[in-house]
Each structure stands twice: as C-alpha cells, then as structure tokens.
Curated annotation (Swiss-Prot):
UniProt-recorded name of the protein: Serine/threonine-protein phosphatase 4 regulatory subunit 3A
Limits of the WH1 domain: 1-100
Cellular component GO terms held in the UniProt record: centrosome; cytoplasm; cytosol; nuclear speck; nucleus; protein phosphatase 4 complex
Principal location listed in the UniProt entry: cytoplasm
Biological-process GO terms, alphabetical: gluconeogenesis; positive regulation of gluconeogenesis
Keyword Phosphoprotein applies: yes
Complex formation: Serine/threonine-protein phosphatase 4 (PP4) occurs in different assemblies of the catalytic and one or more regulatory subunits. Component of the PP4 complex PPP4C-PPP4R2-PPP4R3A. Interacts with PPP4C; the interaction requires PPP4R2.
Record's subcellular location: Cytoplasm; Cytoplasm, Cytoskeleton, Microtubule organizing center, Centrosome; Nucleus
Record region (Disordered): 670-699, 720-820
Statement: the UniProt record of this protein carries the keyword Cytoplasm: yes
SUPFAM superfamilies from the UniProt entry: ARM repeat, PH domain-like
Molecular function GO terms recorded: protein phosphatase regulator activity
Length: 820
C-alpha cells in the first residue's frame, strides 16, 4: 500500500507516561475472523509485518486529537495512539470507528472514559445537557463552583467540556480576564485562575487547541498568574515576552514551523512553570497535555530535518571564520537546544536525527568550535558532543580514526577533548568530570562493534594508544618526576584522580594495549609516587590502580613489579599510616591478603624476602604472618621435592575431586587395619611402589620429629601468651633511606613473655620465626572472643594447615607404622 493518507506511526504509553514509538506502517480496517469483529490493522512499511491488530470494541473510548491523532486504551494501563501523516487518512479511520460504535464522526470522543455507578449514570443521562451560566463578571464565582463540582465525575467533565467547546466559552472568559485586569478586580482574577486550571483538568484536546492558539495562549497564561494562594501575582507573561525572546539565528521560511516552535515552548512553560506540580492531581489528569507537547516536538524535529537549506546554512555559518563571535555563540546554543530537543524522541526518530546531523558534518564543525577561545561556546559544544557520544560512540570513533590519517595529533578531536579536561578552570572540575565520562564511553570495548572483516576494538584501541594516551598521561608524568608529587594542591589532585580512574578502567578492559604502555613507560612507578600525596583520596586512587593490576594475576605485571621494587611505596605508606584504622590501612592489608589467599607465589616470595623486617611486628591481623607461612611452605617444597611428592600422596592429592571418589578412598583408608599392611609399609599407589623406601621415609621421619618439636614449643607459647583479645597496631616503624630493599622496622611495644623474637632460619628445626601453628591457633582463640582483624580470614588459615592436620588425625596404629 503506497497511499500516504494511511501512513501512520504506532505509539504505546509506557510506565513513565511517555510515548514509545512502535514503528511506521500503513493502517487499514477490516473484519478479522479470529477477533470476531471489525479491527484496525497496521502493517510495517519496511517488511510488511503486523505492527497492530486491534478490534474496534463498541465500548472503548476513542479520542481524536489535533486532527491527525487517534488515542485509545486497549486495557488497563495500556494506551495506544495512531499518528497519521495526513488529516484525510485520520478522518477516514475515525469515520470507520464511529460507524462501528454508532457514533457521529463529528465528535472527538466516542465514549465516557471512566464508568460510573448505575444510579449516577441514570441521573446524568436523564438530565438535560449542562447549561453554563452567562459569562459575566457577577457570575464568575458561580462558574468556578460549577467547574469544580464537575471534575470528580467523568460524565460531568465530558458534558462541561462539550458545553465550553460548543458555546465558544473560553474566548468569552478571556475577554472577562481583560476587564478584570483593567478594573484591578482581584477577586474576579482569582476566580478565573480556578476556572482555567479546572479546564486544564478536563483533559480535552479540542479545548487545548483553543487555549494554545496564537490569540489565546498569552491570556491563558495571564489567568494562571493570579493564584489565590500567593500574595502577589507571578509575572509569567513578562518573562515570555521580554526575557525569553525568540532568536531566529537562521531564518525559518516555513511559517507553520515557526508558529509550532512558539506554541510548543509556551505550552512546555505552562506545564513546567505555571501549573502546580502534577502530584497534586489525580493520576493521568494531564495526560492529554503531555501528549500534545510530545507530538508537537516530533513534528518540529521532522520539519527541521526535512529543511535541508536550514541545516546547510546552520553548519556553514558555524564553521565560517567570518562569522562573528556573538553570532557563533547563538548558532551553537541553537544546535545544543536542537539536540536536547531530540532526547524526547523515540530511538527510531533519534536515529534519523543524528544521521542527518552526521551527514551535515556536525563532528568537523564541533572540532572547529572546540578549538576556539570562547569558553561558553566550547561548553555548549561539549554538551553537543556528549549527546553524540551517548547516542552513537561508534560514529565518533570512526571519525577520529579517519581524521588521524590527515591531521597531526595536536588537533585531533579526541585530543582536544582530553586537553579541555586537563585544562578545566572550574575549581570543582565539573567539566572535566563530564569529559572523563565521555572518554570512558569511547574507550569502552563493551560498546564496540565486531564484524567479519574488521574489529572496531582492535583498530580504535591501537589508534588511541598511539595518538592519544600520551596526552592523557602528560599531567601524571609531569607531576611525578621526584619521590613525591611536585604539585599537590586540591585541584591538581582532583585532576590526577580523574586520570587514574580512567587508567584503572583501561587496566581492567584493555589487556595487552595498556599492559605494554604501563611497562614500557614505567607508569606504575609514577602512579605510586602519588601515594605520598597529602590528599588521601589521591593516594587511594593510586593504590586502587595497583590493586587492579595485581588482581589480574598476570606474571608480566608481577615481574615488572618485582624488578622495580614497586611494593616499597605501598609499604612506606602503610608504615607511615601508623596505628590509624582507616581506609588506607584496610585497603593495603586487603591487597596483601589477596596475594596470600590467591597464593601468588612470585609476589609472596618478593614481599617476604624484601619487606618482612618491616612487617613482622604487624600482629593485629594474620595477613603478613600468613604470607610468611606461604613463603616457608613454598621454600620447603623447593628444598624437599620428594617430601612434597609424598605429602601429596598422603593428602589424597589435596585438590578437590569428585566427592564420591574422595569418600570411597577415605573409607578404604580408615577401614584398613594392621593386617592390611605388609611388613610395616604404608599402602601407596602401585605407581609409587617402585620408589626406594628409604628415599621416602627418611624425610618423613625428619619432618615428624620437627613437627613434634614445634608443637611442644607452641603449647608453651600459648600458655604464656595473654589471649585477652586483638592487639592494637601500636607499633612504631621507621624507614631507612638506603637501598630500595632496606626497609627496617622497630616495635615500641614490649614483647610478650615467651613470644617469638626476630625470625631465624625458617628451615632450621625449632626456628622461632617458624610458628605457623601458633599463629593459626592464636587467631582461632581470638576469633572465639568475638574480635576479628580488619582483613582477617581465619577460614583460609585453616585451609592452609588442613593437610598437616590430617596427619594428626591418622589412627595410632598407622602413625606407629610411619614412625617405626
């Protein structure tokens, strides 16, 4: 079907009382067997699919609005609308609906909107039509009472609306308004306020078209200035005529479009500023007013898009060097308002809108505008850019990659955005925060497209790290040339925090691009300089950046961290924080706890070998002692690979397997008695029977002897130690300024009687520094007392020692056979 008269858009009203566009198609009417009646059918013009199939129900209230709209409710809270391209098509379908319902096509509504009680309906139907009082000054109070009394009843509202419409009553009321103002009749003006407000609540399109006409709308606004609850009238008309003057920056040749823009602005002003807040009214009382504004906006955007001369002139003047600054500012502000206007459109309409702007060259125009000195113009251009990025980031990426082939890095659009972020003069960096959000959207791989021939992620990130990343990190590198930030004022700290936030996002999402950049440019070392900042939020941003890197558990990063000794700034910050329980203390402990729990072997060894002296006295959490235990276990396995192999056998391979298999093997083990042993040998898997018994049993015997000795020492320590609760980290530690690994600590707290002193050789029997059992038992008893460290995971400690504990749970007969 190619008849444009029947071309329509289908809309549904969502939960937020906004209209959603369901598609464009052609409407027809006909009998549908499945629905058993005449129905409205809309088929999509793109593929012929069925957009709407709605039976014309004899009892459904259909409304005709603005000559080209038909609105109705299918069910509770499900409103539909057909917006016709031409009035003739709307009239044809309206006649068909009225024919089915047996109504006169001259009416604008076919049924009462809300059912009433039978008694009330009978009374109203038996009474004659509503008779309005004569429109005179002396009867304004009576008219106001009539309007107020009609609002609760839908049928009375309908009768009142018809009477007002048929008698041209609104224009008569507005004539009285002029008389009251001339006579300064305040009482009469107060009555007119109540009358006009009540007419809005009638929710009638035909009345709105009269009230919002060019000759009436300012008088309607005038009536609404005289709110009886206010001591002085508002000056809405003065604002609209003097302050909010319409500036036609580009001549609009279409008078209908110009009138529609004026009308929409004023009606929007009435809705937002003049009428009381919507919460005062019953739900849906102003739904027709919302619809009136919405469809006006759709129409305006469509008319502007179709006016190619208007848009061509707009962009030509924007980029013309001869355009004076005041004119350019007006043009940019108009374009900004135009884009803001489009946000009310549905996705399909917005798609066409931004595609039109793109074809007209909006991005090159923005690039020119952003390079100008006028801060107001640049600010408006930034807002326009944000609309484009939010709606279609791929379009922006494609543009910046294409221009990189022709222009230097300094004048690339994305680099201009970064420079404006860095150079934001606002003390609160409001503009910088907005721009950082836009950059984050542009570099987010989640909204990048992938096709068979090319991947936008690979291409754009390659471009970004080659042409733009050095601009983003410039303030960071400039401020971290020494051991502490060269500038540490609040605004600089805020800016660097924004840069770090974006870099942290890149670490999480960009894999090898950011990895190569960090390692090649030594970025992490520079970032950790900021841990010496006096601003805690900046130091925490730097720590968060490192924590994100460690969280990846990437050995390339780990080797870089160890090679450059990049735990030193963190340990320094931890020690300088002293005994304060704050976010810095918790965040640092959490980072080391992550290394322990995840058993990152390389970092565990690096931390203990280089920083144990500084951390060994931290006993209010078990994190660092747990790290030391991990380290000793690693070294023990390295020194005794055969012991490690045997232990894995005794642990039943330690790692979690199928639960049923595990239970069967445990049952076999514990059901085995001495008769199952041959010549005092342990039962091992057949693959291990070929091993030399002495090679296996000798280290086991030594291990059991050391274990017994440790347990006896630990019992003595526990008996002497006061387990009254968690100790406060009231230690005083100093840092020497020698080599990077020369971190020393000194405890100001007196050692507990019998507590371990400085650690000796971890591998020697009975070494005071090797007390894993004491550590875990102390932690367990403290937990029973109800006090737990800031970042303390006793369950993890139990898991670490679980396998050693299993040996103690073996039957006595089996222990004897191992020790014999």
């Amino acid at each position: 079907m190619t008849d444009t008269r029947r071309r329509v858009k289908v809309y549904t009203l969502n939960e937020d009382r906004q209209w959603d566009d369901r598609g464009t198609g052609h409407v027809s009417s006909g009998y549908v067997e499945r629905l058993k009646g005449m129905s409205l059918l809309v088929r999509a013009e793109s593929d012929g699919s069925l957009l709407l199939e709605s039976k014309i129900n004899p009892n459904t209230a259909y409304q005709k609005q603005q000559d080209t709209l038909i609105v109705w409710s299918e069910a509770e809270n499900y409103d539909l609308a057909l917006s016709f391209q031409e009035k003739a098509g709307c009239d044809e379908i309206w006649e068909k609906i009225c024919q089915v319902q047996g109504k006169d096509p001259s009416v604008d509504i076919t049924q009462d909107l809300v059912d009433e009680s039978e008694e009330e309906r009978f009374d109203d139907m038996s009474s004659p039509g509503l008779e309005l009082p004569s429109c005179e000054l002396s009867r304004l109070e009576e008219i106001a009472e009539l309007v107020a009394s009609s609002l609760p009843s839908p049928l009375r509202r309908e009768k009142l609306a018809l009477a007002l419409e048929n008698e041209g009553y609104i224009k008569k009321l507005l004539e009285l308004f002029h008389v009251c103002e001339d006579l300064e009749n305040i009482e009469g003006l107060h009555h007119l306020y109540e009358i006009i407000k009540g007419i809005f609540l009638l929710n009638r399109t035909a009345l709105f078209e009269v009230m919002f006409s060019e000759e009436c709308i300012m008088d309607v606004i005038g009536c609404l200035e005289y709110d009886p609850t206010l001591s002085q009238p508002r000056k809405h008309r003065e604002f609209l005529t003097k302050t909010a003057k319409f500036k036609e920056v580009i001549p609009i040749s279409d008078p209908e479009l110009k009138q529609k823009i004026h009308q929409t602005y004023r009606v929007q002003y009435i809705q937002d500023m003049v009428l009381p807040t919507p919460s005062v009214f019953e739900e849906n009382m102003l739904s027709t007013l919302h619809s009136f504004i919405f469809f006006n906006k759709v129409e305006i955007v469509g008319m502007l898009q179709e006016d190619e001369k208007f848009l061509t002139d707009l962009f030509a003047q924007l980029t013309d060097e001869a355009t004076d600054e005041e004119k350019r500012q007006e043009l940019v502000n108009f374009l900004k308002e135009f884009c803001a206007f489009s946000q009310t459109l549905q996705p399909q309409n917005r798609d066409a809108f931004f595609k039109t702007l793109s074809n007209m060259g909006i991005l090159p125009a923005l690039e020119v505008i952003l390079g100008m000195d006028d801060t107001q113009v640049r600010s408006a251009a930034t807002d326009i850019f944000s609309y484009l990025v939010e709606y279609n980031p791929s379009m922006v990426r494609e543009f910046v990659m294409q221009e990189a082939q022709q222009n230097d890095d300094d004048i690339l659009l994305i680099n201009l955005i970064i420079e404006h972020m860095i150079c934001d003069t606002d003390p609160e960096l409001g503009g910088a925060v907005q721009l950082m959000g836009l950059l984050r959207t542009l570099v987010d791989p989640e909204n990048m497209l992938a096709t068979a021939n090319k991947t936008e992620k690979t291409e754009f990130l390659g471009f970004f790290y080659k042409h733009c990343m050095h601009v983003l990190t410039a303030p960071l590198l400039a401020n971290t040339t020494e051991d502490k930030p060269s500038k540490d004022d609040f605004q600089t700290a805020q800016l660097l925090a924004l840069v770090l936030e974006l870099l942290t996002f890149c670490v999480e999402h960009h894999t090898y691009h950011i990895k190569n950049y960090i390692i090649n440019k030594d970025i992490l070392r520079r970032v950790l300089v900021l841990m010496a900042s006096k601003h805690a939020f900046l130091a925490l941003c730097a720590l968060r950046f490192k924590r994100k890197i460690i969280g990846l558990k990437d050995e390339f990063y780990n080797r870089y961290i160890m090679k450059s000794f990049l735990f030193e700034p963190v340990v320094k910050a931890f020690l300088n924080n002293g005994s304060r329980y704050n976010l810095m203390n918790s965040a640092i402990i959490e980072m080391f706890e992550f290394i322990r729990v995840e058993d990152i072997k390389s970092l565990t060894a690096h931390v203990i070998e280089n920083y144990w002296k500084a951390l060994e006295d931290v006993d209010y959490v078990q994190t660092f002692k747990g790290l030391k235990l991990r380290f000793e276990q690693q070294r023990e396995r390295q020194d005794n690979p055969k012991l490690d192999s045997m232990r894995s056998i005794l642990r039943n391979h330690r790692y979690r397997r199928d639960a049923r298999t595990l239970e069967d093997e445990e049952e076999m083990w514990f059901n085995t008695d001495e008769d199952d042993m041959e010549d005092g040998e342990a039962v091992v898997s057949p693959s291990d029977k070929t091993k030399n018994d002495d090679d296996i049993m000798d280290p086991i015997s030594k291990f059991m002897e050391r274990k017994k000795l440790k347990e006896s020492e630990e019992k003595e320590v526990l008996l002497k130690t006061n387990l009254s609760g968690r100790q406060s980290p009231s230690f005083k530690l100093s840092l020497s300024s020698g080599t990077k690994t020369n971190l020393t600590s000194q405890s100001s707290a007196t050692s507990l009687p019998g507590s371990p002193g400085s650690p000796g050789s971890p591998g020697s029997p009975g070494s005071p520094g090797s007390v894993p059992k004491s550590t875990s038992q102390t932690a367990a008893i403290t937990t029973k007392g109800g006090l737990v460290g800031l970042v303390d995971y006793p369950d993890d400690d139990e898991d670490d020692d679980e396998d050693e504990d299993k040996e103690d749970t073996l039957p006595v007969s089996k222990k004897a056979k191992f020790e014999s």
